[in-house]
Amino acid sequence: MPGNSPHYGRWPQHDFTSLKKLRPQSVTSRIQPGSDVIVCAEMDEQWGYVGAKSRQRWLFYAYDSLRKTVVAHVFGERTMATLGRLMSLLSPFDVVIWMTDGWPLYESRLKGKLHVISKRYTQRIERHNLNLRQHLARLGRKSLSFSKSVELHDKVIGHYLNIKHYQ
């Protein structure tokens, strides 16, 4: 009976305290810095939004194409500062070759390192972007499921990366 439901006529209230307690790590523990070498690291950024599409939130991350795992990730605006935060997380790792798309900030940040700019060599991370969009509805471009706060957006996606790649 519709009248017997405790939520009849109003939306149920959700308790997000368990999500707010999440403390996802930003770097993998599967690869030991200094002892393991990352031969090919693909880097890319993925667009998302919080509340409205005008409030963009970017996920920058590096993907080890041989181990098929995410090495590190950061959230922020699509700027050199966010890319710098990702690079500082990756600095303890011995990366031989960096592979990126044609975004100009990658070229300026990776000057002096072995850097390949090609769509052909970033297809694994681009496929991983698609997998993230398929698994996490809040990353979909046209979806009714979107994040309402920056904190929960970062924690939910970070927790997913922890479960699938960092443990």
Swiss-Prot record:
GO terms for biological process: DNA transposition. It comes from the Bacteria. GO terms for molecular function: DNA binding; transposase activity. Keywords: DNA recombination, Transposable element, Transposition. InterPro entries: Transposase_27, Transposase_27_IS1. Belongs to the transposase 27 family. Absolutely required for transposition of IS1. This is Insertion element IS1 5 protein InsB. It comes from Escherichia coli (strain K12). The lineage of its organism: Bacteria, Pseudomonadati, Pseudomonadota, Gammaproteobacteria, Enterobacterales.
